[in-house]
Regions:
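C-terminal peripheral helix-coil segments that are non-catalytic and often amphipathic
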Residues: 1-4, 135, 139-146, 171, ...
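Short, structured helix-loop boundary elements
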Residues: 10, 17-18, 38, 60, ...
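Generic hydrophobic, amphipathic alpha-helix propensity
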Residues: 13-25, 41, 66-70, 74, ...
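Helix-turn-helix
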Residues: 19, 27-61, 65
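Short coil/turn segments at alpha/beta junctions that flank glycine-rich nucleotide-binding fingerprints
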Residues: 30-34, 106, 147
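Hydrophobic alpha-helical connector segments
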Residues: 65, 76-108, 159-162, 187-190, ...
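Amphipathic alpha-helical packing segments from all-alpha helical-bundle domains
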Residues: 69-75, 121-147, 156-172, 188, ...
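Short linear capping/connector segments at secondary-structure termini
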Residues: 112-120, 213-214
Length: 226
Protein backbone atom coordinates (compact mmCIF):
# COMPACT_ATOMS: atom_id res chain seq x y z
CA UNK A 1 0.00 0.00 0.00
CA UNK A 2 1.31 3.47 -0.91
CA UNK A 3 1.72 5.71 2.11
CA UNK A 4 -0.10 9.02 1.78
CA UNK A 5 0.60 11.85 4.15
CA UNK A 6 -2.50 13.11 5.92
CA UNK A 7 -3.36 16.79 6.00
CA UNK A 8 -2.30 16.99 9.65
CA UNK A 9 1.06 15.39 8.90
CA UNK A 10 1.68 17.82 6.05
CA UNK A 11 0.79 20.74 8.31
CA UNK A 12 3.09 19.47 11.05
CA UNK A 13 6.00 19.05 8.64
CA UNK A 14 5.44 22.52 7.21
CA UNK A 15 5.29 24.03 10.69
CA UNK A 16 8.55 22.34 11.67
CA UNK A 17 10.26 23.60 8.53
CA UNK A 18 8.97 27.11 9.22
CA UNK A 19 10.25 26.91 12.80
CA UNK A 20 13.72 25.96 11.59
CA UNK A 21 13.76 28.85 9.13
CA UNK A 22 12.52 31.24 11.82
CA UNK A 23 15.31 30.08 14.13
CA UNK A 24 17.87 30.60 11.36
CA UNK A 25 16.50 34.07 10.75
CA UNK A 26 16.77 34.98 14.43
CA UNK A 27 20.36 33.76 14.48
CA UNK A 28 21.24 35.79 11.38
CA UNK A 29 19.57 38.90 12.79
CA UNK A 30 21.71 38.61 15.92
CA UNK A 31 25.05 37.57 14.46
CA UNK A 32 24.83 37.66 10.68
CA UNK A 33 25.18 34.56 8.55
CA UNK A 34 28.11 33.47 10.71
CA UNK A 35 25.51 32.71 13.37
CA UNK A 36 23.59 30.34 11.13
CA UNK A 37 25.05 26.98 12.17
CA UNK A 38 23.09 23.74 12.15
CA UNK A 39 23.42 22.79 15.83
CA UNK A 40 22.57 26.22 17.33
CA UNK A 41 19.68 26.64 14.90
CA UNK A 42 18.36 23.23 15.96
CA UNK A 43 18.46 24.30 19.60
CA UNK A 44 16.55 27.50 18.81
CA UNK A 45 13.95 25.54 16.85
CA UNK A 46 13.70 22.92 19.63
CA UNK A 47 14.53 20.06 17.27
CA UNK A 48 17.44 17.67 16.85
CA UNK A 49 20.26 18.58 14.48
CA UNK A 50 19.34 15.55 12.42
CA UNK A 51 15.87 17.00 11.94
CA UNK A 52 17.36 20.16 10.46
CA UNK A 53 19.30 18.05 7.97
CA UNK A 54 16.12 16.21 7.07
CA UNK A 55 14.62 19.47 5.83
CA UNK A 56 17.83 21.13 4.67
CA UNK A 57 20.47 18.56 3.61
CA UNK A 58 23.34 21.04 4.01
CA UNK A 59 24.15 24.39 5.52
CA UNK A 60 24.17 25.82 2.00
CA UNK A 61 20.58 24.68 1.55
CA UNK A 62 19.53 26.27 4.84
CA UNK A 63 21.24 29.60 4.19
CA UNK A 64 20.02 29.72 0.60
CA UNK A 65 16.43 29.15 1.66
CA UNK A 66 16.81 31.74 4.43
CA UNK A 67 17.97 34.31 1.86
CA UNK A 68 15.04 33.40 -0.38
CA UNK A 69 12.54 33.66 2.49
CA UNK A 70 13.81 37.04 3.68
CA UNK A 71 13.73 38.33 0.11
CA UNK A 72 10.18 37.07 -0.44
CA UNK A 73 9.04 38.94 2.66
CA UNK A 74 10.76 42.13 1.53
CA UNK A 75 9.35 41.86 -1.98
CA UNK A 76 5.84 41.38 -0.60
CA UNK A 77 6.26 44.43 1.64
CA UNK A 78 7.51 46.52 -1.28
CA UNK A 79 4.50 45.55 -3.38
CA UNK A 80 2.02 46.23 -0.58
CA UNK A 81 3.46 49.68 0.04
CA UNK A 82 3.63 50.60 -3.64
CA UNK A 83 0.19 49.22 -4.48
CA UNK A 84 -1.34 51.28 -1.68
CA UNK A 85 0.11 54.52 -3.08
CA UNK A 86 -2.20 56.87 -5.03
CA UNK A 87 0.01 57.28 -8.10
CA UNK A 88 3.15 55.99 -9.87
CA UNK A 89 5.56 58.53 -8.36
CA UNK A 90 4.33 57.94 -4.83
CA UNK A 91 4.39 54.19 -5.52
CA UNK A 92 8.07 54.44 -6.46
CA UNK A 93 8.78 56.50 -3.35
CA UNK A 94 6.94 53.93 -1.22
CA UNK A 95 8.91 51.08 -2.77
CA UNK A 96 12.26 52.79 -2.19
CA UNK A 97 11.33 53.77 1.37
CA UNK A 98 10.35 50.17 2.11
CA UNK A 99 13.71 48.90 0.88
CA UNK A 100 15.49 51.42 3.09
CA UNK A 101 13.39 50.66 6.17
CA UNK A 102 13.80 46.89 5.75
CA UNK A 103 17.55 47.28 5.31
CA UNK A 104 17.95 49.46 8.40
CA UNK A 105 15.54 47.52 10.59
CA UNK A 106 17.85 44.48 10.74
CA UNK A 107 21.21 45.50 9.39
CA UNK A 108 23.05 42.28 10.24
CA UNK A 109 20.38 40.21 8.55
CA UNK A 110 20.36 42.53 5.53
CA UNK A 111 24.14 42.37 5.16
CA UNK A 112 24.01 38.60 5.54
CA UNK A 113 21.46 38.33 2.75
CA UNK A 114 23.34 40.72 0.49
CA UNK A 115 27.05 40.16 0.74
CA UNK A 116 28.43 38.85 4.04
CA UNK A 117 31.17 36.28 3.33
CA UNK A 118 29.96 32.78 4.16
CA UNK A 119 31.69 29.41 4.04
CA UNK A 120 29.16 27.91 1.61
CA UNK A 121 28.09 28.90 -1.88
CA UNK A 122 24.84 30.87 -1.79
CA UNK A 123 25.52 33.04 -4.83
CA UNK A 124 22.55 31.70 -6.80
CA UNK A 125 20.10 32.56 -4.04
CA UNK A 126 21.59 36.01 -3.59
CA UNK A 127 21.45 36.71 -7.31
CA UNK A 128 17.82 35.60 -7.53
CA UNK A 129 16.96 37.81 -4.56
CA UNK A 130 18.55 40.90 -6.06
CA UNK A 131 17.04 40.24 -9.48
CA UNK A 132 13.49 40.01 -8.12
CA UNK A 133 13.68 43.17 -6.05
CA UNK A 134 15.45 45.10 -8.81
CA UNK A 135 12.73 43.96 -11.20
CA UNK A 136 10.04 45.33 -8.90
CA UNK A 137 11.79 48.70 -8.57
CA UNK A 138 12.29 48.79 -12.35
CA UNK A 139 8.57 48.21 -12.86
CA UNK A 140 7.75 51.14 -10.57
CA UNK A 141 10.21 53.41 -12.40
CA UNK A 142 8.74 52.30 -15.72
CA UNK A 143 5.21 53.12 -14.55
CA UNK A 144 6.31 56.62 -13.56
CA UNK A 145 8.03 57.09 -16.93
CA UNK A 146 4.91 55.99 -18.82
CA UNK A 147 2.82 58.41 -16.76
CA UNK A 148 5.12 61.25 -17.78
CA UNK A 149 6.43 61.81 -14.25
CA UNK A 150 10.00 60.78 -15.10
CA UNK A 151 12.19 61.14 -18.20
CA UNK A 152 12.75 58.14 -20.46
CA UNK A 153 15.59 55.95 -19.20
CA UNK A 154 16.94 52.42 -18.96
CA UNK A 155 14.71 51.41 -16.06
CA UNK A 156 16.45 48.10 -15.38
CA UNK A 157 19.84 49.80 -15.11
CA UNK A 158 18.39 52.62 -13.01
CA UNK A 159 16.78 50.16 -10.58
CA UNK A 160 20.01 48.21 -10.20
CA UNK A 161 21.94 51.43 -9.57
CA UNK A 162 19.44 52.60 -6.96
CA UNK A 163 19.51 49.34 -5.03
CA UNK A 164 23.30 49.26 -5.10
CA UNK A 165 23.49 52.81 -3.78
CA UNK A 166 20.93 52.20 -1.02
CA UNK A 167 22.52 48.99 0.19
CA UNK A 168 26.05 50.38 0.10
CA UNK A 169 24.99 53.51 1.98
CA UNK A 170 22.98 51.72 4.67
CA UNK A 171 24.79 48.43 5.35
CA UNK A 172 27.96 48.38 3.26
CA UNK A 173 31.48 48.69 4.71
CA UNK A 174 31.32 52.50 4.52
CA UNK A 175 27.83 52.80 6.03
CA UNK A 176 27.63 55.07 9.09
CA UNK A 177 27.00 53.65 12.54
CA UNK A 178 24.90 54.88 15.44
CA UNK A 179 21.45 53.96 14.11
CA UNK A 180 20.69 51.54 16.94
CA UNK A 181 17.66 52.64 18.98
CA UNK A 182 17.82 56.14 17.47
CA UNK A 183 14.63 56.79 15.57
CA UNK A 184 15.71 60.29 14.52
CA UNK A 185 18.84 58.96 12.81
CA UNK A 186 16.88 56.13 11.24
CA UNK A 187 14.33 58.56 9.84
CA UNK A 188 17.01 60.92 8.55
CA UNK A 189 18.85 58.07 6.84
CA UNK A 190 15.69 56.77 5.17
CA UNK A 191 14.74 60.25 3.99
CA UNK A 192 18.23 60.97 2.68
CA UNK A 193 18.57 57.83 0.58
CA UNK A 194 14.98 58.00 -0.67
CA UNK A 195 15.42 61.62 -1.76
CA UNK A 196 18.71 60.72 -3.44
CA UNK A 197 17.04 57.87 -5.31
CA UNK A 198 14.09 59.94 -6.51
CA UNK A 199 16.35 62.73 -7.70
CA UNK A 200 18.59 60.20 -9.45
CA UNK A 201 15.78 58.93 -11.68
CA UNK A 202 14.75 62.47 -12.58
CA UNK A 203 11.97 63.50 -10.23
CA UNK A 204 11.74 67.26 -9.77
CA UNK A 205 13.26 68.23 -6.43
CA UNK A 206 10.21 69.86 -4.86
CA UNK A 207 8.05 66.88 -5.76
CA UNK A 208 10.70 64.45 -4.52
CA UNK A 209 10.91 66.24 -1.17
CA UNK A 210 7.15 66.13 -0.77
CA UNK A 211 7.01 62.41 -1.46
CA UNK A 212 9.82 61.70 1.00
CA UNK A 213 8.03 63.53 3.80
CA UNK A 214 4.82 61.62 3.06
CA UNK A 215 6.51 58.22 3.01
CA UNK A 216 8.86 58.28 5.97
CA UNK A 217 6.81 56.84 8.80
CA UNK A 218 8.87 54.35 10.77
CA UNK A 219 6.95 51.50 12.42
CA UNK A 220 7.78 50.54 15.99
CA UNK A 221 9.23 47.23 14.85
CA UNK A 222 11.83 49.10 12.78
CA UNK A 223 14.08 49.14 15.81
CA UNK A 224 13.94 45.39 16.37
CA UNK A 225 17.31 43.88 15.63
CA UNK A 226 18.76 47.12 14.29
Amino acid sequence: MVYRRTHQVVKRLAARRAAILAAAREAAAEAGMAGVQIAPVAVRANVAAGTVYRYFPSKADLVSELIAAVSRDELAAIRRAADAAPGPSSALAAAITTVAVHTLSQRKLAWGVLAEPVDVDVSASRLASRREIAGEIAARIDAAVRAGHLPAQDTALAATALLGALHEALVGPLAPHGFDNNRAKLRDAVQTVTLFALRAVGLVDARARGLVVQQTVLPAETLIGA
